[in-house]
Amino acid sequence: MSERSRGILFVLIAATIWSIGGLGIKVIQTDAMAISGYRSFFAIPVLLIWLFGKASNKLPALGLSLQRPWVWAAALSYALTLTCFVVATKLTTAANTILLQSMAPIYVALLSWPLLKERIRGLDWLAIAGCLLGMLFFFRDQLSPAGFTGNIVAIIAGVGFAGITLFLRLDQLKMSQQHGSGHSAHVSAVVSVALGNILAALIGLPWMISSPPPTVAGWLVVVGLGMVQIALAYLFFTAGVARLTAIESTLLALVEPILNPIWVALGTGETPSRSALIGGTMIVVSVTVRGIIQSLSPKLKAAQS
């Protein structure tokens, strides 16, 4: 099997594992904050084993990562995403949660101007308009107060996910200016993910104590969500993206928002509304088309020169 084929396989495995998160969260009958805390708690050992095993030769880089503010900012953003994703999934449909969170690349485009001084291009504005129009469809339904709140929390999860990318990019730019290109951006990313899970577990600690899963099955699901759906999937994804282009990884990862509502529908009978399907399609198409054109632009310019 070629390296590219392995990359495709690894990203598809990661996206498929990620997609079971909605169903797992739905079937555990306890508080959302407790689920979030336990999920992150059980992800931590797997991530730490990788850091101190696979990256043991990069311990100096690991230590430096812990001293950098943008790495901690990325960790806080990841903790926000982890927590809000679980809360939103409990409050609204799994489809609404994952599709609204999928707008993260659009938030990156919007926030790149104030944070990175990167100009927002016409293509970005078109994608932003498409996503905002799609978002309106999610709020057209006669939502309960919980459903409306869930949609808002899902949007916050997407903003948090965008923050991870932005803050790690800021960290990379600062380190490149100070030390050249010799630092390990990959180690910084895994450190941020591990720290984010530690923070999410600490945030959920009061609910973990007061509202643990009431059944053995619930415990097994939450352990699986942490060790497999969060930690193992992330390691598969990082192994895959190292072998693929950015656009290939992005497009393959779209398997997650497609499969997530399907597993939930099969497992619980929950189905998204027609408006949510229309809005979700608009968001996925807007993000995908923007990514494809963005990837092809340098190649087209090179071919014309």
Task: Label the model's feature ranges.
Residues 1-38, 84, 129, 143-175, ...:
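Glycine-/small-residue-enriched transmembrane alpha-helix faces in small-molecule transporters
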Residues 30-80, 107-108, 160-167, 191-210, ...:
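Transmembrane alpha-helices of multi-pass small-molecule transport proteins
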Residues 3-7, 29-37, 62-68, 140-160, ...:
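Juxtamembrane helix-entry segments on the extracytoplasmic side of multipass membrane proteins
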Residues 1, 40, 51, 254-305:
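C-terminal-most transmembrane helix of multi-pass membrane proteins
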